[in-house]
Curated annotation (Swiss-Prot):
<feature type="disulfide bond">
    <location>
        <begin position="497"/>
        <end position="513"/>
    </location>
</feature>
<dbReference type="InterPro" id="IPR035971">
    <property type="entry name" value="CBD_sf"/>
</dbReference>
<feature type="signal peptide">
    <location>
        <begin position="1"/>
        <end position="17"/>
    </location>
</feature>
<dbReference type="GO" id="GO:0030248">
    <property type="term" value="F:cellulose binding"/>
</dbReference>
<keyword id="KW-0326">Glycosidase</keyword>
<dbReference type="InterPro" id="IPR013320">
    <property type="entry name" value="ConA-like_dom_sf"/>
</dbReference>
<feature type="active site" description="Nucleophile">
    <location>
        <position position="229"/>
    </location>
</feature>
<dbReference type="GO" id="GO:0030245">
    <property type="term" value="P:cellulose catabolic process"/>
</dbReference>
<dbReference type="GO" id="GO:0016162">
    <property type="term" value="F:cellulose 1,4-beta-cellobiosidase activity"/>
</dbReference>
<keyword id="KW-0378">Hydrolase</keyword>
<feature type="domain" description="CBM1">
    <location>
        <begin position="478"/>
        <end position="514"/>
    </location>
</feature>
<feature type="active site" description="Proton donor">
    <location>
        <position position="234"/>
    </location>
</feature>
<keyword id="KW-1015">Disulfide bond</keyword>
<dbReference type="InterPro" id="IPR001722">
    <property type="entry name" value="Glyco_hydro_7"/>
</dbReference>
<dbReference type="InterPro" id="IPR000254">
    <property type="entry name" value="Cellulose-bd_dom_fun"/>
</dbReference>
<feature type="region of interest" description="Disordered">
    <location>
        <begin position="408"/>
        <end position="433"/>
    </location>
</feature>
<keyword id="KW-0136">Cellulose degradation</keyword>
Protein backbone atom coordinates (compact mmCIF):
# COMPACT_ATOMS: atom_id res chain seq x y z
CA UNK A 1 0.00 0.00 0.00
CA UNK A 2 1.12 3.51 -0.78
CA UNK A 3 -1.02 5.50 1.59
CA UNK A 4 -1.29 9.29 1.56
CA UNK A 5 -4.71 10.16 2.94
CA UNK A 6 -6.61 13.27 1.89
CA UNK A 7 -7.56 15.76 4.59
CA UNK A 8 -9.93 18.65 5.18
CA UNK A 9 -9.35 22.17 3.94
CA UNK A 10 -10.15 25.87 3.88
CA UNK A 11 -11.26 28.11 6.73
CA UNK A 12 -11.14 25.48 9.45
CA UNK A 13 -8.14 23.49 8.29
CA UNK A 14 -7.73 19.96 9.57
CA UNK A 15 -4.78 19.51 11.90
CA UNK A 16 -3.83 17.38 14.81
CA UNK A 17 -2.98 18.84 18.19
CA UNK A 18 -2.62 17.44 21.69
CA UNK A 19 -4.65 19.77 23.93
CA UNK A 20 -8.47 19.78 23.99
CA UNK A 21 -10.93 22.64 23.45
CA UNK A 22 -14.73 22.70 23.34
CA UNK A 23 -15.86 25.47 21.00
CA UNK A 24 -17.50 22.69 18.96
CA UNK A 25 -19.50 19.83 20.46
CA UNK A 26 -18.08 16.33 20.03
CA UNK A 27 -20.82 13.73 19.40
CA UNK A 28 -19.48 10.47 18.01
CA UNK A 29 -21.58 8.38 15.59
CA UNK A 30 -22.82 5.20 17.26
CA UNK A 31 -21.93 1.91 15.58
CA UNK A 32 -23.11 -1.55 16.63
CA UNK A 33 -20.92 -4.56 15.85
CA UNK A 34 -21.05 -8.23 16.86
CA UNK A 35 -18.80 -10.41 18.99
CA UNK A 36 -19.21 -14.09 18.14
CA UNK A 37 -18.60 -17.53 19.62
CA UNK A 38 -19.37 -21.00 18.29
CA UNK A 39 -22.89 -20.66 19.71
CA UNK A 40 -23.73 -17.36 18.06
CA UNK A 41 -23.15 -13.62 18.04
CA UNK A 42 -24.15 -10.80 20.38
CA UNK A 43 -24.29 -7.07 19.74
CA UNK A 44 -21.69 -4.66 21.09
CA UNK A 45 -22.60 -0.98 21.31
CA UNK A 46 -19.66 1.04 20.04
CA UNK A 47 -18.94 4.30 18.25
CA UNK A 48 -16.44 5.77 15.82
CA UNK A 49 -14.08 8.72 16.18
CA UNK A 50 -12.48 10.73 13.39
CA UNK A 51 -8.70 10.91 13.23
CA UNK A 52 -7.24 14.00 14.85
CA UNK A 53 -5.54 14.97 11.57
CA UNK A 54 -8.93 16.12 10.26
CA UNK A 55 -9.92 18.28 13.24
CA UNK A 56 -9.95 22.03 13.66
CA UNK A 57 -6.81 22.97 15.56
CA UNK A 58 -6.52 26.37 17.14
CA UNK A 59 -4.92 28.22 20.02
CA UNK A 60 -6.09 27.19 23.46
CA UNK A 61 -6.56 30.88 24.27
CA UNK A 62 -8.97 31.57 21.39
CA UNK A 63 -9.96 30.52 17.88
CA UNK A 64 -6.85 31.43 15.88
CA UNK A 65 -5.76 28.54 13.66
CA UNK A 66 -2.47 26.84 14.46
CA UNK A 67 -2.48 25.25 11.00
CA UNK A 68 -4.16 26.65 7.89
CA UNK A 69 -4.23 25.04 4.45
CA UNK A 70 -0.98 23.06 4.44
CA UNK A 71 1.13 25.33 6.63
CA UNK A 72 1.80 25.81 10.33
CA UNK A 73 1.55 29.25 11.89
CA UNK A 74 5.19 29.61 12.91
CA UNK A 75 4.40 32.57 15.16
CA UNK A 76 2.52 30.10 17.37
CA UNK A 77 4.40 26.91 16.57
CA UNK A 78 7.99 27.99 17.12
CA UNK A 79 8.92 24.36 17.81
CA UNK A 80 7.09 21.06 18.19
CA UNK A 81 6.78 21.03 21.97
CA UNK A 82 5.59 24.63 22.19
CA UNK A 83 3.04 24.03 19.44
CA UNK A 84 1.55 21.07 21.33
CA UNK A 85 1.26 23.20 24.44
CA UNK A 86 -0.40 26.16 22.72
CA UNK A 87 -2.76 24.35 20.33
CA UNK A 88 -5.86 22.26 20.92
CA UNK A 89 -8.14 19.82 19.13
CA UNK A 90 -11.82 20.70 18.95
CA UNK A 91 -15.01 18.72 18.58
CA UNK A 92 -16.24 17.44 15.21
CA UNK A 93 -19.48 17.77 13.24
CA UNK A 94 -19.30 14.30 11.73
CA UNK A 95 -22.02 14.51 9.11
CA UNK A 96 -22.03 18.22 8.30
CA UNK A 97 -18.27 18.72 8.00
CA UNK A 98 -16.86 15.26 7.27
CA UNK A 99 -19.64 13.30 5.52
CA UNK A 100 -19.58 10.54 8.14
CA UNK A 101 -22.91 8.97 9.10
CA UNK A 102 -24.01 5.83 10.91
CA UNK A 103 -27.22 3.88 11.35
CA UNK A 104 -27.38 0.77 13.50
CA UNK A 105 -24.50 -1.43 12.33
CA UNK A 106 -23.66 0.60 9.20
CA UNK A 107 -21.01 3.29 8.78
CA UNK A 108 -20.98 5.44 5.62
CA UNK A 109 -18.05 7.60 4.55
CA UNK A 110 -18.52 10.32 1.94
CA UNK A 111 -15.75 11.50 -0.37
CA UNK A 112 -16.26 15.27 -0.77
CA UNK A 113 -18.31 17.17 1.80
CA UNK A 114 -18.97 20.89 1.50
CA UNK A 115 -19.41 21.89 5.12
CA UNK A 116 -20.32 25.23 6.69
CA UNK A 117 -16.68 26.33 6.94
CA UNK A 118 -14.72 23.98 4.72
CA UNK A 119 -14.52 21.48 1.89
CA UNK A 120 -13.57 18.09 3.33
CA UNK A 121 -11.90 15.28 1.39
CA UNK A 122 -12.21 11.71 2.67
CA UNK A 123 -11.85 10.58 6.27
CA UNK A 124 -10.18 8.12 8.61
CA UNK A 125 -12.10 6.73 11.59
CA UNK A 126 -11.51 4.31 14.45
CA UNK A 127 -13.87 1.96 16.29
CA UNK A 128 -14.16 2.91 19.97
CA UNK A 129 -14.73 0.66 22.98
CA UNK A 130 -15.76 3.59 25.14
CA UNK A 131 -15.32 7.35 25.21
CA UNK A 132 -11.60 7.18 25.97
CA UNK A 133 -10.24 3.97 24.44
CA UNK A 134 -10.16 2.29 21.06
CA UNK A 135 -11.70 -1.16 20.61
CA UNK A 136 -8.85 -3.66 20.46
CA UNK A 137 -8.80 -6.88 18.41
CA UNK A 138 -6.45 -9.87 18.62
CA UNK A 139 -6.77 -11.42 15.17
CA UNK A 140 -4.67 -14.59 15.39
CA UNK A 141 -6.91 -17.66 15.57
CA UNK A 142 -9.96 -15.58 14.75
CA UNK A 143 -11.85 -14.18 11.78
CA UNK A 144 -13.09 -10.69 10.93
CA UNK A 145 -16.20 -10.27 8.80
CA UNK A 146 -18.06 -7.27 7.42
CA UNK A 147 -20.46 -6.29 4.66
CA UNK A 148 -19.35 -3.66 2.17
CA UNK A 149 -20.90 -1.70 -0.68
CA UNK A 150 -18.18 -0.50 -3.08
CA UNK A 151 -20.54 0.31 -5.95
CA UNK A 152 -20.09 4.02 -5.25
CA UNK A 153 -16.28 4.15 -5.42
CA UNK A 154 -14.45 3.66 -8.72
CA UNK A 155 -10.93 4.06 -10.09
CA UNK A 156 -8.61 6.05 -7.84
CA UNK A 157 -10.60 5.72 -4.61
CA UNK A 158 -9.97 3.30 -1.75
CA UNK A 159 -12.42 2.26 0.94
CA UNK A 160 -10.14 0.60 3.46
CA UNK A 161 -10.85 -1.21 6.74
CA UNK A 162 -7.47 -2.16 8.20
CA UNK A 163 -5.84 -2.92 11.53
CA UNK A 164 -2.81 -1.16 13.02
CA UNK A 165 -0.87 -1.54 16.27
CA UNK A 166 -1.89 1.80 17.78
CA UNK A 167 -1.98 2.43 21.52
CA UNK A 168 -5.36 1.71 23.09
CA UNK A 169 -5.55 5.23 24.54
CA UNK A 170 -4.08 6.95 21.48
CA UNK A 171 -0.73 7.47 23.22
CA UNK A 172 -2.14 9.63 26.01
CA UNK A 173 -0.45 7.73 28.84
CA UNK A 174 2.83 7.22 26.99
CA UNK A 175 3.40 10.81 25.87
CA UNK A 176 2.93 13.63 28.37
CA UNK A 177 2.34 16.19 25.62
CA UNK A 178 -0.75 14.32 24.42
CA UNK A 179 -3.74 15.47 26.46
CA UNK A 180 -6.38 14.49 23.88
CA UNK A 181 -5.90 10.75 23.42
CA UNK A 182 -8.22 8.30 21.71
CA UNK A 183 -11.26 10.41 22.55
CA UNK A 184 -10.09 12.83 19.85
CA UNK A 185 -8.54 10.29 17.48
CA UNK A 186 -4.82 10.61 18.26
CA UNK A 187 -2.00 8.09 17.88
CA UNK A 188 -2.26 6.88 14.28
CA UNK A 189 0.58 4.81 12.84
CA UNK A 190 1.02 2.35 10.00
CA UNK A 191 3.68 0.55 7.97
CA UNK A 192 4.30 3.55 5.71
CA UNK A 193 5.66 5.39 8.79
CA UNK A 194 3.58 8.40 7.65
CA UNK A 195 5.18 11.80 8.01
CA UNK A 196 2.04 13.78 7.18
CA UNK A 197 0.66 13.18 10.69
CA UNK A 198 0.72 16.60 12.31
CA UNK A 199 1.39 15.59 15.91
CA UNK A 200 3.50 12.56 16.82
CA UNK A 201 4.48 11.35 20.31
CA UNK A 202 2.88 14.39 21.91
CA UNK A 203 4.75 17.04 19.89
CA UNK A 204 3.90 18.90 16.70
CA UNK A 205 5.47 17.66 13.48
CA UNK A 206 6.08 21.28 12.51
CA UNK A 207 9.87 21.17 12.38
CA UNK A 208 11.07 20.61 8.83
CA UNK A 209 7.48 20.70 7.57
CA UNK A 210 7.25 20.98 3.77
CA UNK A 211 3.81 21.80 2.30
CA UNK A 212 2.69 19.44 -0.46
CA UNK A 213 2.92 20.64 -4.06
CA UNK A 214 -0.32 18.86 -5.01
CA UNK A 215 -2.37 18.65 -1.81
CA UNK A 216 -3.50 22.04 -0.52
CA UNK A 217 -4.13 20.54 2.94
CA UNK A 218 -1.11 18.34 3.62
CA UNK A 219 2.65 18.27 3.92
CA UNK A 220 5.53 16.21 5.28
CA UNK A 221 7.44 16.83 8.50
CA UNK A 222 10.65 15.45 9.96
CA UNK A 223 8.82 12.91 12.12
CA UNK A 224 7.05 9.72 11.08
CA UNK A 225 4.95 7.26 13.06
CA UNK A 226 5.34 3.52 12.48
CA UNK A 227 3.69 0.23 13.44
CA UNK A 228 2.61 -3.11 11.95
CA UNK A 229 -0.44 -3.05 9.70
CA UNK A 230 -2.93 -5.62 8.42
CA UNK A 231 -4.83 -4.37 5.40
CA UNK A 232 -8.03 -6.39 5.55
CA UNK A 233 -9.59 -4.69 2.56
CA UNK A 234 -8.21 -2.08 0.21
CA UNK A 235 -10.75 -1.80 -2.55
CA UNK A 236 -12.95 0.02 -4.99
CA UNK A 237 -15.39 -1.39 -7.54
CA UNK A 238 -12.52 -2.47 -9.84
CA UNK A 239 -9.86 -4.09 -7.64
CA UNK A 240 -9.27 -5.34 -4.12
CA UNK A 241 -6.28 -6.56 -2.10
CA UNK A 242 -5.55 -7.84 1.40
CA UNK A 243 -2.01 -7.30 2.65
CA UNK A 244 0.01 -7.87 5.85
CA UNK A 245 2.84 -5.41 6.62
CA UNK A 246 5.25 -6.45 9.43
CA UNK A 247 7.68 -4.18 11.27
CA UNK A 248 10.79 -4.93 13.28
CA UNK A 249 9.09 -3.29 16.29
CA UNK A 250 5.61 -4.41 17.39
CA UNK A 251 4.23 -1.19 18.85
CA UNK A 252 3.92 2.42 17.74
CA UNK A 253 7.28 4.13 17.39
CA UNK A 254 8.55 7.30 15.74
CA UNK A 255 11.23 7.84 13.12
CA UNK A 256 13.03 10.79 11.56
CA UNK A 257 13.44 11.87 7.94
CA UNK A 258 14.33 9.42 5.21
CA UNK A 259 15.18 6.79 7.82
CA UNK A 260 11.40 6.37 8.12
CA UNK A 261 11.20 4.69 4.73
CA UNK A 262 7.83 4.23 3.05
CA UNK A 263 5.86 6.50 0.75
CA UNK A 264 7.05 9.70 2.36
CA UNK A 265 10.81 9.16 2.10
CA UNK A 266 13.40 8.98 -0.68
CA UNK A 267 14.56 5.56 0.60
CA UNK A 268 11.37 3.47 0.57
CA UNK A 269 13.05 0.51 2.28
CA UNK A 270 15.13 2.44 4.81
CA UNK A 271 12.77 2.17 7.78
CA UNK A 272 11.61 -0.36 10.35
CA UNK A 273 8.43 -1.41 8.49
CA UNK A 274 7.59 -3.24 5.28
CA UNK A 275 5.88 -0.59 3.17
CA UNK A 276 5.04 -2.96 0.28
CA UNK A 277 3.63 -5.90 2.21
CA UNK A 278 2.64 -9.25 0.73
CA UNK A 279 -0.61 -8.69 -1.12
CA UNK A 280 -3.28 -10.90 -2.63
CA UNK A 281 -5.01 -9.08 -5.49
CA UNK A 282 -6.93 -11.51 -7.73
CA UNK A 283 -6.32 -9.38 -10.84
CA UNK A 284 -2.60 -9.13 -10.11
CA UNK A 285 -2.53 -12.91 -9.60
CA UNK A 286 -3.90 -13.39 -13.12
CA UNK A 287 -7.66 -13.80 -12.59
CA UNK A 288 -9.23 -10.83 -14.37
CA UNK A 289 -12.83 -12.02 -14.08
CA UNK A 290 -13.03 -12.76 -10.35
CA UNK A 291 -13.88 -9.29 -8.97
CA UNK A 292 -15.56 -6.39 -10.71
CA UNK A 293 -18.81 -4.68 -11.72
CA UNK A 294 -21.38 -6.98 -13.33
CA UNK A 295 -22.75 -10.50 -13.29
CA UNK A 296 -19.86 -11.81 -15.42
CA UNK A 297 -17.58 -11.54 -12.36
CA UNK A 298 -17.51 -14.10 -9.54
CA UNK A 299 -17.85 -11.18 -7.12
CA UNK A 300 -20.20 -8.53 -8.52
CA UNK A 301 -19.19 -5.15 -7.10
CA UNK A 302 -22.48 -3.53 -8.10
CA UNK A 303 -24.00 -5.45 -5.16
CA UNK A 304 -23.26 -5.61 -1.45
CA UNK A 305 -21.01 -8.47 -0.36
CA UNK A 306 -19.78 -10.06 2.85
CA UNK A 307 -16.00 -10.30 3.29
CA UNK A 308 -14.54 -12.94 5.64
CA UNK A 309 -10.84 -12.89 6.55
CA UNK A 310 -9.44 -15.75 8.66
CA UNK A 311 -6.16 -15.84 10.57
CA UNK A 312 -5.21 -19.49 11.09
CA UNK A 313 -2.86 -20.91 13.70
CA UNK A 314 -0.55 -23.78 12.91
CA UNK A 315 0.27 -26.64 15.27
CA UNK A 316 2.94 -24.44 16.87
CA UNK A 317 0.41 -21.74 17.73
CA UNK A 318 1.87 -19.33 15.19
CA UNK A 319 0.27 -17.77 12.12
CA UNK A 320 0.09 -20.37 9.34
CA UNK A 321 -2.27 -18.89 6.76
CA UNK A 322 -4.55 -15.93 6.03
CA UNK A 323 -7.61 -17.02 4.06
CA UNK A 324 -10.41 -15.07 2.38
CA UNK A 325 -14.02 -16.02 1.69
CA UNK A 326 -16.91 -14.02 0.29
CA UNK A 327 -20.66 -14.36 0.73
CA UNK A 328 -22.90 -12.89 -1.96
CA UNK A 329 -26.46 -13.73 -2.98
CA UNK A 330 -26.55 -16.37 -0.23
CA UNK A 331 -23.54 -18.25 -1.59
CA UNK A 332 -20.13 -18.71 0.04
CA UNK A 333 -17.49 -18.00 -2.61
CA UNK A 334 -13.90 -19.15 -2.16
CA UNK A 335 -11.11 -16.73 -2.95
CA UNK A 336 -9.62 -16.73 -6.44
CA UNK A 337 -6.82 -19.15 -7.27
CA UNK A 338 -3.63 -17.51 -8.49
CA UNK A 339 -2.94 -18.14 -12.18
CA UNK A 340 0.66 -16.92 -12.03
CA UNK A 341 3.15 -19.65 -12.97
CA UNK A 342 5.41 -20.42 -10.03
CA UNK A 343 3.12 -18.65 -7.54
CA UNK A 344 0.08 -20.88 -6.95
CA UNK A 345 -2.45 -20.55 -4.16
CA UNK A 346 -5.63 -18.81 -3.05
CA UNK A 347 -4.43 -17.58 0.35
CA UNK A 348 -1.48 -15.90 1.97
CA UNK A 349 1.20 -18.14 3.47
CA UNK A 350 4.91 -17.77 4.08
CA UNK A 351 5.59 -19.86 0.98
CA UNK A 352 3.16 -17.85 -1.17
CA UNK A 353 4.78 -14.56 -0.14
CA UNK A 354 8.32 -15.79 -0.84
CA UNK A 355 7.37 -17.12 -4.26
CA UNK A 356 5.42 -13.98 -5.16
CA UNK A 357 8.39 -11.71 -4.44
CA UNK A 358 10.62 -13.94 -6.56
CA UNK A 359 8.24 -14.36 -9.50
CA UNK A 360 7.26 -10.68 -9.61
CA UNK A 361 10.86 -9.54 -9.16
CA UNK A 362 9.88 -7.37 -6.19
CA UNK A 363 12.23 -6.40 -3.37
CA UNK A 364 11.55 -8.81 -0.51
CA UNK A 365 11.37 -6.26 2.27
CA UNK A 366 8.58 -8.36 3.78
CA UNK A 367 11.11 -10.97 4.93
CA UNK A 368 13.67 -8.36 5.99
CA UNK A 369 11.17 -6.58 8.28
CA UNK A 370 10.00 -9.68 10.14
CA UNK A 371 8.12 -11.68 7.54
CA UNK A 372 5.57 -14.26 8.55
CA UNK A 373 6.86 -14.57 12.12
CA UNK A 374 6.79 -10.83 12.61
CA UNK A 375 3.23 -10.67 11.33
CA UNK A 376 2.27 -13.52 13.65
CA UNK A 377 3.54 -11.49 16.59
CA UNK A 378 1.58 -8.42 15.47
CA UNK A 379 -1.66 -10.36 14.98
CA UNK A 380 -1.25 -11.96 18.43
CA UNK A 381 -1.23 -8.52 20.03
CA UNK A 382 -4.13 -6.04 20.25
CA UNK A 383 -4.76 -3.90 17.16
CA UNK A 384 -7.13 -1.02 16.35
CA UNK A 385 -9.72 -1.14 13.56
CA UNK A 386 -9.39 1.73 11.09
CA UNK A 387 -12.06 2.51 8.48
CA UNK A 388 -11.19 5.10 5.84
CA UNK A 389 -11.97 6.51 2.42
CA UNK A 390 -9.14 8.20 0.56
CA UNK A 391 -7.48 9.13 -2.71
CA UNK A 392 -3.78 9.08 -3.45
CA UNK A 393 -1.59 12.12 -4.15
CA UNK A 394 1.49 9.92 -4.51
CA UNK A 395 0.56 7.40 -7.21
CA UNK A 396 -3.13 7.97 -8.01
CA UNK A 397 -4.04 4.55 -6.52
CA UNK A 398 -2.59 2.87 -9.62
CA UNK A 399 -0.82 0.32 -7.39
CA UNK A 400 -4.30 -1.00 -6.53
CA UNK A 401 -6.38 -0.74 -9.70
CA UNK A 402 -4.22 -0.16 -12.81
CA UNK A 403 -0.77 -0.96 -14.24
CA UNK A 404 1.98 0.13 -11.86
CA UNK A 405 4.62 1.23 -12.60
CA UNK A 406 2.71 2.62 -15.57
CA UNK A 407 5.39 1.71 -18.12
CA UNK A 408 5.99 -1.80 -16.78
CA UNK A 409 5.28 -4.96 -18.78
CA UNK A 410 6.60 -7.44 -16.20
CA UNK A 411 4.43 -10.03 -14.50
CA UNK A 412 2.64 -8.60 -11.47
CA UNK A 413 2.48 -5.03 -12.76
CA UNK A 414 -1.17 -5.33 -13.86
CA UNK A 415 -3.26 -4.79 -10.75
CA UNK A 416 -6.61 -3.73 -12.26
CA UNK A 417 -8.38 -2.52 -15.39
CA UNK A 418 -8.32 1.22 -14.63
CA UNK A 419 -6.49 3.45 -17.11
CA UNK A 420 -2.98 4.55 -16.15
CA UNK A 421 -4.23 8.14 -16.49
CA UNK A 422 -6.98 7.62 -13.91
CA UNK A 423 -7.06 8.43 -10.21
CA UNK A 424 -5.72 11.99 -10.23
CA UNK A 425 -7.01 13.58 -7.00
CA UNK A 426 -8.07 16.86 -8.64
CA UNK A 427 -10.04 14.93 -11.29
CA UNK A 428 -11.77 12.80 -8.68
CA UNK A 429 -12.73 15.77 -6.52
CA UNK A 430 -14.20 17.49 -9.58
CA UNK A 431 -15.84 14.53 -11.32
CA UNK A 432 -17.03 12.14 -8.59
CA UNK A 433 -17.46 14.22 -5.41
CA UNK A 434 -20.53 12.25 -4.32
CA UNK A 435 -18.66 8.94 -4.11
CA UNK A 436 -19.16 7.04 -0.86
CA UNK A 437 -18.55 3.66 0.73
CA UNK A 438 -20.50 1.82 3.43
CA UNK A 439 -19.26 -0.79 5.90
CA UNK A 440 -21.79 -2.73 7.96
CA UNK A 441 -22.54 -5.89 9.95
CA UNK A 442 -19.04 -6.13 11.45
CA UNK A 443 -18.46 -9.46 13.20
CA UNK A 444 -15.45 -10.85 15.06
CA UNK A 445 -14.86 -14.23 16.65
CA UNK A 446 -13.25 -17.67 16.35
CA UNK A 447 -12.83 -19.09 12.86
CA UNK A 448 -16.18 -20.28 11.52
CA UNK A 449 -18.29 -18.25 13.97
CA UNK A 450 -19.15 -15.12 11.98
CA UNK A 451 -20.94 -16.70 9.00
CA UNK A 452 -22.60 -20.00 8.08
CA UNK A 453 -21.83 -22.23 5.16
CA UNK A 454 -25.20 -21.38 3.63
CA UNK A 455 -24.38 -17.67 3.74
CA UNK A 456 -26.77 -16.81 6.59
CA UNK A 457 -26.01 -14.95 9.81
CA UNK A 458 -25.40 -17.02 12.97
CA UNK A 459 -28.21 -16.98 15.52
CA UNK A 460 -27.65 -14.89 18.66
CA UNK A 461 -26.81 -16.76 21.89
CA UNK A 462 -29.05 -16.63 24.93
CA UNK A 463 -26.64 -14.32 26.74
CA UNK A 464 -23.81 -11.95 25.90
CA UNK A 465 -20.76 -13.55 24.36
CA UNK A 466 -17.07 -12.78 24.52
CA UNK A 467 -14.23 -13.72 22.22
CA UNK A 468 -13.30 -17.33 22.98
CA UNK A 469 -11.19 -20.08 21.54
CA UNK A 470 -11.15 -20.79 17.84
CA UNK A 471 -14.12 -23.17 17.46
CA UNK A 472 -16.12 -23.26 14.21
CA UNK A 473 -19.91 -23.06 14.19
CA UNK A 474 -21.20 -26.53 13.28
CA UNK A 475 -23.72 -26.64 10.43
CA UNK A 476 -26.86 -28.76 10.83
CA UNK A 477 -26.62 -32.51 10.41
CA UNK A 478 -27.33 -34.11 7.04
CA UNK A 479 -26.15 -33.47 3.54
CA UNK A 480 -24.87 -30.08 2.44
CA UNK A 481 -26.43 -27.77 -0.16
CA UNK A 482 -24.51 -26.28 -3.10
CA UNK A 483 -21.85 -23.76 -1.96
CA UNK A 484 -21.98 -25.08 1.62
CA UNK A 485 -18.92 -26.18 3.61
CA UNK A 486 -18.25 -29.92 3.53
CA UNK A 487 -14.73 -30.28 4.96
CA UNK A 488 -11.55 -28.70 6.28
CA UNK A 489 -9.32 -28.76 9.34
CA UNK A 490 -11.33 -28.50 12.61
CA UNK A 491 -14.58 -28.91 10.65
CA UNK A 492 -16.93 -31.45 12.26
CA UNK A 493 -20.09 -31.06 10.18
CA UNK A 494 -21.53 -33.21 7.39
CA UNK A 495 -19.21 -34.06 4.51
CA UNK A 496 -21.75 -35.37 1.99
CA UNK A 497 -23.12 -32.99 -0.63
CA UNK A 498 -26.67 -33.08 -1.95
CA UNK A 499 -26.90 -34.55 -5.44
CA UNK A 500 -25.55 -33.72 -7.98
CA UNK A 501 -22.87 -31.72 -6.13
CA UNK A 502 -19.49 -32.98 -4.93
CA UNK A 503 -17.18 -31.84 -2.15
CA UNK A 504 -14.21 -29.92 -3.55
CA UNK A 505 -11.18 -28.99 -1.45
CA UNK A 506 -10.49 -25.25 -1.66
CA UNK A 507 -7.64 -25.24 0.88
CA UNK A 508 -6.65 -27.13 4.04
CA UNK A 509 -9.27 -25.27 6.05
CA UNK A 510 -12.21 -25.22 3.68
CA UNK A 511 -13.95 -27.60 1.26
CA UNK A 512 -17.13 -26.62 -0.57
CA UNK A 513 -20.04 -28.40 -2.30
CA UNK A 514 -19.93 -27.48 -5.99
Amino acid sequence: MYRIVATASALIAAARAQQVCSLNTETKPALTWSKCTSSGCSDVKGSVVIDANWRWTHQTSGSTNCYTGNKWDTSICTDGKTCAEKCCLDGADYSGTYGITSSGNQLSLGFVTNGPYSKNIGSRTYLMENENTYQMFQLLGNEFTFDVDVSGIGCGLNGAPHFVSMDEDGGKAKYSGNKAGAKYGTGYCDAQCPRDVKFINGVANSEGWKPSDSDVNAGVGNLGTCCPEMDIWEANSISTAFTPHPCTKLTQHSCTGDSCGGTYSSDRYGGTCDADGCDFNAYRQGNKTFYGPGSNFNIDTTKKMTVVTQFHKGSNGRLSEITRLYVQNGKVIANSESKIAGNPGSSLTSDFCSKQKSVFGDIDDFSKKGGWNGMSDALSAPMVLVMSLWHDHHSNMLWLDSTYPTDSTKVGSQRGSCATTSGKPSDLERDVPNSKVSFSNIKFGPIGSTYKSDGTTPNPPASSSTTGSSTPTNPPAGSVDQWGQCGGQNYSGPTTCKSPFTCKKINDFYSQCQ
